[in-house]
Amino acid sequence: MAHPSQLGFQDAASPVMEELXHFHDHTLMIVFLISTLVXYIIVAMVSTKLTNKYVLDSQEIEIV
């Protein structure tokens, strides 16, 4: 049941909707972990001082 001062959505009214909410939460967690990993790799590649002199035109960013 929705309340007047409620900030989020109301509770699921059916088991299918409840499972859909769990699926959504699980999917967002996976997307967040993948995005964090990619951002960490990009930051590590940009901030490292060990660069290959034969890599031209910022090809290291295309590896990611």
From Swiss-Prot:
Reading the lineage from the top rank, the first entry is Eukaryota
What is the cofactor note? Binds a dinuclear copper A center per subunit.
Q: Which residues lie on this side of the membrane: Mitochondrial matrix?
A: 46-64
Q: Does the keyword Transport apply?
A: yes
Q: Name one GO molecular function term.
A: cytochrome-c oxidase activity
Please write the reaction equations for the catalytic activity of this protein. Answer: 4 Fe(II)-[cytochrome c] + O2 + 8 H(+)(in) = 4 Fe(III)-[cytochrome c] + 2 H2O + 4 H(+)(out)
> Pfam families, from UniProt?
COX2_TM
Q: What does this protein's UniProt record list under function?
A: Component of the cytochrome c oxidase, the last enzyme in the mitochondrial electron transport chain which drives oxidative phosphorylation. The respiratory chain contains 3 multisubunit complexes succinate dehydrogenase (complex II, CII), ubiquinol-cytochrome c oxidoreductase (cytochrome b-c1 complex, complex III, CIII) and cytochrome c oxidase (complex IV, CIV), that cooperate to transfer electrons derived from NADH and succinate to molecular oxygen, creating an electrochemical gradient over the inner membrane that drives transmembrane transport and the ATP synthase.
- Please state which protein family the record places this protein in: Belongs to the cytochrome c oxidase subunit 2 family.
What are the annotated GO cellular component locations? mitochondrial inner membrane; respiratory chain complex IV
| All ranges on the Mitochondrial intermembrane side of the membrane | 1-14
Lineage of producing organism: Eukaryota, Metazoa, Chordata, Craniata, Vertebrata
Keyword annotations for this protein, in alphabetical order, are: Copper, Electron transport, Membrane, Mitochondrion, Mitochondrion inner membrane, Respiratory chain, Translocase, Transmembrane, Transmembrane helix, Transport
Protein name, per record? Cytochrome c oxidase subunit 2
Q: Which SUPFAM superfamilies match?
A: Cytochrome c oxidase subunit II-like, transmembrane region (SSF81464)
- Show the disulfide pairing: none
GO terms, biological process: electron transport chain
Cofactors per UniProt?
Cu cation
Which EC numbers does the record give?
Answer: 7.1.1.9
Q: Which residue ranges does UniProt annotate as crossing the membrane?
A: 15-45
Protein topology in the membrane: Multi-pass membrane protein
The UniProt gene name for this protein comes to mt-co2
